[in-house]
Amino acid sequence: MSDTPTRKTDLRVIIVGGSVAGLTLAHCLANANIDHIVLEKRAEISPQEGAFLGIWPNGGRIFDQLGVYADLEKCTVPIHKMRVRFPDGVSFSSELPRQVQERFGYPIISLDRQKVLEILYNRYPAKSNIHVNKKVTEIRQTEREAQVLTADGAVYKGDLVVGADGIHSAVRAEMWRQAKDLVGRRDRQDVNHEIAAFTVEYACVFGISSPISGLESGEHVNSYSNGLCVITFHGKDGRVFWFILIKLQKRFIYPFTPRFSASDAAKICAEYANVPVWGDICVRDLWGNKTSVSMTALEEGLLETWRFKRVVLLGDSIHKMTPNIGQGANTAAEDAGVLASLLQRLSTSDSSATSCTIDAVLQEYASLRYERVKSTYQRAYFGARLHTRDDALKAFVGRYIFPRFRQQVLERTSQAIAGAPQVDFLPTPKRTGPGWSDYAGSPEVGAPTLPWLVISLPVLASMLCYLVYSSVFVTPIFP
């Protein structure tokens, strides 16, 4: 743990969810000497689900502050080259990943979600604070405290409840239930609108495969087709992390969304077995070398209400996007860093943890995060549709416009990375690059004028599409 100012205000935080978001927040609070527990509904913290994460410099710097980045980096190799293939067989390569590392000191890395959770758990200093098999059934709030009830009959009391329990968040459901009970009919309609904010238009097959000749470690491939895309990342010892994004025939509204099984994944990969990935490699090769695979519906949505009294959300429970831009773990880390910084400031102040002071902290957290997350979410939303060539304009820009403006993309990307938050009360890591200072003072990173490039071409092309829409590069662009 780091040396922090003396705590004056006793705080107890209940984190629901042993996710990347939840464990990152737990690390932050441990460093701030803030009392906390983690409640995880599953029997283990790091199950193998066939999923993987991309970590960019904005997330990497926070993980470095927490002392876990070196362990993450040992498990993989940095991405140094990006390769892109279009349906007509035309392809090109980009050095953008290497250039980003040179500017910011951290590479782009990709590794198993299971391994990230395992490292976060193993490096956590107070494992007795983490409780598994704790399914939340109810949250109660009073003027003085919040109470979390679990299926085994236990009751946990604290000053604040944090929902880091993912898209199917029990904390979010309880927050909505309480809000509906306390508001009038008109406001209740607003709550119902929030409940329906998550939608599904895409499904995704996630897989990890043993080495495939022609897919080199440290490289990343984007293969675009009409209605689907195949994206691969090649890690340590040639392991291949991949996903296939498929546009569904109809739009679903959460929670009435489709569920998929391993047999569904097999059918999809059989149907698209001949879709090219890179060179002579096709989807059949990814499937033939698979070591794990899963298929899921991809929820998309960003809620406007992040808190209610002593309850607050972070990570996928509040903002959910497709994996094309690889920003989920990075955004969750930013959420955790900002919330922990505000709680640390409260804990070292002369204020007590009253309902008013807690509400002020949570309001500031939502205010600081919303615009940046909104910008990221919109680019992910557009990127998925660009990747799958959702219409003629996206197909044209991705194919003919994007490759010509790589330097502009790198500059805008650098501005966005440089504006990322970190954990305020922890030292900035010595490992760094000139980009953090060279691009400091750029427009507010959460503003819609700043594009956000994360793990692959989708975001690059998304930005260029918006540049085309705005006619010239010097005018503000949206998302």
From Swiss-Prot:
How would you describe this protein's topology in the membrane? Single-pass membrane protein
A molecular function GO annotation: monooxygenase activity
What EC designation does it have?
1.-.-.-
**Which biological process, per GO, is one annotated for this protein?**
secondary metabolite biosynthetic process
Leader sequence segment:
none
Pathway assignment reads: Secondary metabolite biosynthesis; terpenoid biosynthesis
> Which residues are responsible for catalysis?
Y224
From the Swiss-Prot or TrEMBL record, give the protein name: FAD-dependent monooxygenase ausM
Instruction: Specify the species.
Output: Emericella nidulans (strain FGSC A4 / ATCC 38163 / CBS 112.46 / NRRL 194 / M139) (Aspergillus nidulans)
